[in-house]
């Protein structure tokens, strides 16, 4: 029904928004460590991010079931399987590797000597990030956020495995309609949902770039 489709779109948008926000925060921190730090285990972290991108969503979803469906987790209030929380966690985890690789590529173009020079002039860590790294990484950051947002909305593998009862998402609604031979509903949901998501992504790009240009103008 139309109500189920709207509900699925709302849930998917919520998951995608959370994934993009938390994904960019965590992905930025990981990318900074991989690019500029002397952390001894950064090669291991780099390898893990690459492996996470290569693992199929179905495998990740099954892994989340095994991890978060343990009896002892109920006693400590962390039994997330069968709740929307596990979808949030899985969506964020799926978005981080992609965001991280895009930011690593952007940071590779920014020499560490810029940050070192700023530090020698008395700039603190957060000031270096705010005045040097973030402005130069603007395009990469916007691309990473939009890619994570769009990818999370249509993440069929994870959502079909982990979605709780009475909690539909757009990919689940499309898949269920197709399996029930309701091809018209599936096609309509794909077109309407896709157009809606593309519109939101275009609006986000305009807003993020407009804010950056306004700041640069001052």
Question: Whereabouts are the PLM-identified features?
Answer:
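Interhelical loop and adjacent transmembrane-helix boundary motif
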Residues: 1-4, 153, 159-205
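Periplasmic/extracellular loop-to-transmembrane helix junction in inner-membrane transport proteins
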Residues: 1-21, 180-181
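Membrane-interfacial helix termini and adjacent extracytoplasmic/periplasmic loops
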Residues: 3-6, 37, 41-44, 58-92, ...
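Internal alpha-helical transmembrane segments of multi-pass membrane proteins, especially GPCRs
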Residues: 10-18, 47, 85-88, 129-134, ...
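Hydrophobic positions within alpha-helical transmembrane segments of bacterial inner-membrane proteins
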Residues: 20-28, 32, 58, 62, ...
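C-terminal transmembrane helix and the adjacent membrane-cytosol boundary/short C-terminal tail
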Residues: 33-34, 41, 104-115, 119, ...
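Residue-level recognition of pore/gate-forming positions within transmembrane alpha-helices
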Residues: 50, 66, 91, 151, ...
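Transmembrane alpha-helices
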Residues: 51, 55, 93, 100-103, ...
